[in-house]
A protein has these predicted regions:
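N-terminal accessory nucleic-acid engagement/regulatory domains that precede
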Residues: 1-33
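Post-DEXD/H (motif II) to motif III coupling segment of the RecA-like Helicase ATP-binding lobe
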Residues: 86, 149-207
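Conserved ATPase-coupling elements of RecA-like P-loop NTPase cores
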Residues: 136-140, 149-161, 179, 283-286, ...
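Conserved interdomain hinge at the start of the Helicase C-terminal
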Residues: 74-81, 155, 159, 166, ...
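Inter-Walker segment of RecA-like/P-loop motor cores
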Residues: 94-141
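Conserved RecA-like helicase motor core of SF1/SF2 enzymes
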Residues: 242-304
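Conserved two-lobed SF2 helicase motor
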Residues: 66, 122-142, 265-284
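Conserved strand-helix element at the start of the C-terminal RecA-like helicase core
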Residues: 84-99, 173-175, 180-181, 216-242, ...
Length: 304
C-alpha cells in the first residue's frame, strides 16, 4: 500500500528511479564481467609463466644450504669463475663489490651493477650486482643467487623469487640458510627444473661469552656490532679516544672507503672493528669475538 501511494504521487520520479536501478545492475553485473575477462587473460595465473624465456630452458639448480661461514658462497664462486659468462646476485652493494674485487683479482673480468654504482669493465662477461638489478633478458652460463633466505623478507623478498623463476642460466647456484630450503625447492620444482642439494657444515665452533663485558675489556680482533651509522661512529670515536685504533663499516659507506677500512683491519693496523650487522652478509673478516652493543634493533617499523 505504501509503494502504491508513492507511485500515485504526481511528482514521484519513476523514470529517474528506473534509470538508477538499471545503472546499478549494469555496474554490478555487466561491467565486472567484461572487465574481469580481459584482465584474467593479461595476468598470469601462475607466476612462473611470467618468464617464458626461462620456461623454454632446461635449467639445473645447485642449492648450497647451511649456516653462516660454512663455505656456501665460496663453493658457488669457484664454479662462477670457471664459466664463460656469469652473474652473481647479492643482497647488499657491499657484497657485490666484494665479489667483483675477488673475480677481477683472480683474473676473471667482472663488472659491477647496483642501484647506486655502475662499473663496466671492458670485455667482461661476468657481472656482480644486487639481486634487484638482474637482467632477465640476458643469458648467463652460471648464475649465483646469494643469501636466498631473504626470499621471506616482506619488502625485498620478491627479488629473490623473480631471480629463481626468471634467470636465464642453465646452471643456477643458490646459497641459503636451512629455513628457506623448503620454499626454494617448491619454486624450483614448480618450474620443472632439476635440482640437487649440497649441505654445508661449520668447521669452527661458536662459543658464547658467559656474561656481558665492558668496553675496557675489548681485545684486538674484536668486532663491535651496532645497528645504525650514528651509533657506529659514536663507538668508533670512543674507542679511538681510548687509544684503540678502530676500523668502521656500515652500509652507506662508499666502497673505496670501506675497502680501505677492511684492509687496515686485515693488516692489523687497527685493533678493533665497529660495524653494523651488514658484515654478517658474506663479508669474510678475521674477527676474534663478536660483541653486540645492544640486543635490540629497529627494523624500520618496530624494535625487536
Amino acid at each position: 500500500e505504501a509503494a502504491e501511494a508513492f507511485l500515485a504521487l504526481d511528482d514521484f520520479p519513476v523514470a529517474e528511479l528506473l534509470d538508477y536501478s538499471l545503472y546499478a545492475l549494469y555496474q554490478r553485473d555487466f561491467v565486472p564481467k567484461y572487465i574481469q575477462a580481459p584482465l584474467e587473460q593479461l595476468i598470469e595465473v601462475d607466476p612462473k609463466d611470467e618468464y617464458p624465456a626461462a620456461r623454454l630452458m632446461q635449467r639445473h639448480f645447485v642449492i648450497h644450504v647451511g649456516g653462516t661461514n660454512t663455505g656456501k658462497t665460496y663453493q658457488s664462486i669457484q664454479r662462477l669463475k670457471q664459466a664463460d659468462s656469469g652473474v652473481y646476485l647479492a643482497p647488499l652493494r657491499l657484497l657485490a663489490c666484494e665479489i667483483q674485487d675477488t673475480l677481477n683479482h683472480d683474473g676473471v673480468a667482472c663488472s659491477l651493477l647496483t642501484g647506486e654504482e655502475e662499473d663496466l669493465v671492458p670485455m667482461a662477461r661476468h657481472i656482480a650486482s644486487t639481486v634487484e638489478k638482474l637482467n632477465l633478458y640476458e643469458q648467463y652460463e652460471v648464475c649465483v643467487i646469494d643469501e636466498c633466505q631473504m626470499i621471506a623478507d616482506r619488502e625485498r623478498g620478491f627479488a629473490w623469487t623473480r631471480a629463481i623463476l626468471g634467470c636465464q642460466s642453465e646452471e643456477v647456484h643458490i646459497c641459503t640458510a636451512p629455513e628457506a630450503l623448503s620454499l626454494v625447492l617448491r619454486l624450483i620444482k614448480s618450474c620443472g627444473d632439476t635440482v640437487e642439494v649440497h649441505e654445508h657444515e661449520r668447521t669452527t665452533r661458536l662459543e658464547y661469552l658467559p656474561e656481558p663485558i665492558s668496553l675496557e675489556e675489548t681485545e684486538p680482533g674484536d668486532a663491535l656490532i651496532a645497528f645504525s651509522k650514528k651509533t657506529v661512529l659514536e663507538y668508533a670515536d670512543r674507542m679511538n679516544a681510548a687509544g684503540h685504533p678502530t676500523s668502521i663499516i656500515y652500509g652507506a659507506l662508499p666502497y673505496p672507503a670501506r675497502r680501505m677500512q677492511m684492509d687496515r683491519f686485515l693488516r692489523r693496523e687497527t685493533e678493533l672493528l665497529v660495524a653494523t650487522d651488514a658484515i654478517g652478509m658474506g663479508l669474510n673478516l678475521p674477527v676474534r669475538r663478536i660483541l653486540f652493543t645492544t640486543d635490540k634493533k629497529f627494523d624500520g617499523k618496530h624494535s625487536r
